[in-house]
Regions:
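Beta-strand residues in well-ordered beta-sheet regions across diverse protein folds
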Residues: 39-41, 77
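Outer-membrane beta-barrel transmembrane strands
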Residues: 18-36, 43-45, 135-174
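Surface-exposed loop/interface segments of Gram-negative outer-membrane beta-barrel transport/assembly proteins
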Residues: 1-8, 49-54, 60-151, 167-176
Length: 176
């Protein structure tokens, strides 16, 4: 009984949450001449989530160019974006069965660890029948989801008259 009562008053919310700093950096370059316009950007975004052991990082690249020819009647160009995402940790939203929900519902009498040093459980009557939210986050801290996305199009526009033009474009959206 001492082993249980000495760990009373577990602050589950504090056990599963953390400060969540965010940082975002971008570098842009753009310019134009009479016959061309261009814009390039490189970005980095990083965020720790409010739940421990979870984070998100993204690197993105964007390029837009446009060129004029044939007495300024023809315009060709492209728009291209590439991004690489890295998610670390547990990213689920299972209604009420997630670490955030359990963090405020879990009984404070239950410890994070049992007397053997293993994660303590709580499946039982009158204890909320919830899982150990800290254990769930900790066990998934090395889970990773990597995603690459390529999105772009090329186009050509020809001005037949000032009131009439023809445009053709081809685009792609690749996710992997």
């Amino acid at each position: 009984i001492y082993a249980i009562t000495r760990s009373a008053d577990t602050n589950w919310w504090k056990a599963v949450t953390q400060s969540a700093p965010i940082q975002s950096h971008n570098i842009n370059a753009s310019g134009a001449t009479e016959k061309a316009r261009y814009s390039f950007s490189l970005g980095y975004f990083s965020a720790d989530y409010i739940t421990k052991f979870t984070s998100y990082d993204r690197i993105s690249l964007r390029a837009n160019t446009e060129f004029k020819g044939l007495n300024d009647k023809l315009t060709i160009g492209e728009n291209f974006t590439a991004s690489f995402d890295n998610q670390k940790g547990q990213f689920t939203n299972d209604e009420e069965q997630n670490a955030v929900s359990a963090g405020y519902k879990h009984h404070p009498l239950l410890p994070i660890y049992d007397i053997a040093g293993n994660f303590a459980g709580s499946r039982g009557a009158n204890l909320g029948n919830n899982f150990n939210p800290y254990a769930s986050l900790k066990r998934n801290e090395d889970d990773r989801v990597f995603r690459l996305r390529l999105l772009g199009n090329v186009f050509a526009n020809y001005e037949i008259t000032p009131e009439l033009s023809v445009r053709s474009s081809f685009g792609v959206d690749v996710r992997g």
